[in-house]
């Protein structure tokens, strides 16, 4: 569960390292974002000489959360960190690589490009 003011790691090579969530999209009164939800975030930490700079406002998709998500089969999937992938206006990732595992629920949310770039899909 990601809420406003939550910090997330960046799971791609776009140049940002840490994000802070400032708004959850796709709902007017939603307080928490889960895996597959789109958020608006501000870059708190970035690598120098990259395309994304510190204090830039970006859109991102949550790909991992420490709070477990329950599947239809009864299995609960839980990750070690909160992580997101930065996307552009079309919904495609701005980076060319995705680091770490991602959940299968991203495919249902039509983020197939992120799923195809990920090394492991759980």
Swiss-Prot record:
Function of the protein: Binds to 23S rRNA.
Keywords in alphabetical order: Chloroplast, Plastid, Ribonucleoprotein, Ribosomal protein, RNA-binding, rRNA-binding
SUPFAM superfamilies: Ribosomal protein L14 (SSF50193)
The protein's name in its UniProt record: Large ribosomal subunit protein uL14c
Organism field: Chara vulgaris
GO-annotated molecular function: large ribosomal subunit rRNA binding; structural constituent of ribosome
KW Transport (keyword) present: no
GO biological processes: translation
Organism ancestry: Eukaryota, Viridiplantae, Streptophyta, Charophyceae, Charales
Gene3D superfamilies: Ribosomal protein L14
SMART domains in the cross-refs: Ribosomal_L14
Similarity section: Belongs to the universal ribosomal protein uL14 family.
GO CC aspect terms: chloroplast; cytosolic large ribosomal subunit
Pfam family membership, one: Ribosomal_L14
Listed InterPro entries: Ribosomal_uL14, Ribosomal_uL14_bac-type, Ribosomal_uL14_CS, Ribosomal_uL14_sf
Cellular compartment(s): Plastid, Chloroplast
Subunit-level organization: Part of the 50S ribosomal subunit.
């Amino acid at each position: 569960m990601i809420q406003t003011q939550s910090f997330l790691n960046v799971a791609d090579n776009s140049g940002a390292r840490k994000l802070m969530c400032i708004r959850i999209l796709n709902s007017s009164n939603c307080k928490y974002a889960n895996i597959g939800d789109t958020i608006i975030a501000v870059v708190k930490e970035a690598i120098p000489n990259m395309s994304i700079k510190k204090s830039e406002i970006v859109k991102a998709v949550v790909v991992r959360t420490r709070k477990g998500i329950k599947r239809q089969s009864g299995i609960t999937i839980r990750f070690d960190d909160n992580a997101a992938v930065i996307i552009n206006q079309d919904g495609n990732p701005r980076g060319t690589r995705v680091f770490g595992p991602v959940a299968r629920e991203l495919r249902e949310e039509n983020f197939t490009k992120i799923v195809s770039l990920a090394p492991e899909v759980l």
